[in-house]
């Protein structure tokens, strides 16, 4: 059994390295980077265009403009009418969409490989020739405001998380919601969106990731043909905003119509800045897997099944970002239990790791689970493009993705115990509590993915 497990891990590690073994890269004269990962398992191709611009680059009073511009990118150019982009991709037998984060904005198409040239032409066209029409903007800003109502204002958990971030970060722009504050959306104009586009949507602030059944030399030639003629432009200097050190616990209580209370404990946590030299982010990722990486992990086993103090309990930690990091413990108390009971139980589980450490068996299983999840990401062409694009977006080299897996596998039980002692302290803690209020009779509308 032990030999079978070891073989599976080694095989998975080998597959991970192979999956990212052949990316090829070139940089056009205008500064646009083209990254190609050949994968000939299926006759399809994925194109992802990543702009190094997200909500973190916005200013107070203009929150949400990055996301609004993402919507406007589907409203046409002089040669492609409003909504025509989606129709052409669908007619080619493909799918497309886009997403905005704190750190980047990305657009993708997955199409039969022979249609790659068509979607490359479409993306190159809107990279510099977007039409920001005032009437189209007025319609789309209403769509975005409704999206905010659905995803945040009518979603108590999302509202709590938004308020927590606004308190946890006092100076850094991560305090602002990606979708924007409603007042900023109400006062935003087409000129604001156009200024954002003109400033940041240039080849030297973007990179293109293409994966699939393609030849990298042929892709480079297509990129030169369609993206090459676009002119680059000097970018404004980005002034880094440093978050002041937190000097005590902060608490946020949100009252909203809901059936159940929710608790979130948010701790300031390190971010991966150097893949080779850093160690704590890997150990925290492993700790998260031990606490909440599978059905038999500590939170589910102890808090949900055995002690029945929680209906659910989990942990969220992303160790890559342009800005500062947070680690969140969260849950909903069981019937007859309070938020205070749940907070005490979560703290007790962290204290147990701090005092007793973790077992070799737990660490072994967590490593296997983490490795399996990473391999799963790389199983699809879209997943490979996402993995490459996201790591580049936060300033880390995609060439070292396999090194990240190696570093995870080297995390020791002592490393896990050390980070539990180091980062779970109350001076770096923000506590958020959702206090449920009587339901108002309005239907609680679930958030839905926006289709452009």
PLM regions and their residue ranges:
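Short acidic, Pro/Gly- and aromatic-enriched capping/linker segments at domain boundaries
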Residues: 18-22, 246-248
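Mature N-terminal segment immediately following signal peptide/propeptide cleavage
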Residues: 20-51, 55
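Active-site-flanking beta-strand signature of metal-NTP-handling nucleotidyl enzymes
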Residues: 46-49, 262-267, 432
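His/Glu-based metal-binding/catalytic segments typifying zinc-dependent metallopeptidases
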Residues: 149, 166, 235-296
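Gram-negative bacterial Sec-dependent N-terminal signal peptides
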Residues: 1-20
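M16/MPP (pitrilysin/insulinase) zinc-metallopeptidase core fold and M16-derived inactive scaffolds
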Residues: 23, 47-110, 176-179, 293-309, ...
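Charge-rich, well-structured scaffold segments of protease-associated domains
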Residues: 27, 84-235, 253, 263, ...
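Short strand-connecting beta-turns/loops that link adjacent beta-strands
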Residues: 40-42, 202, 258-259
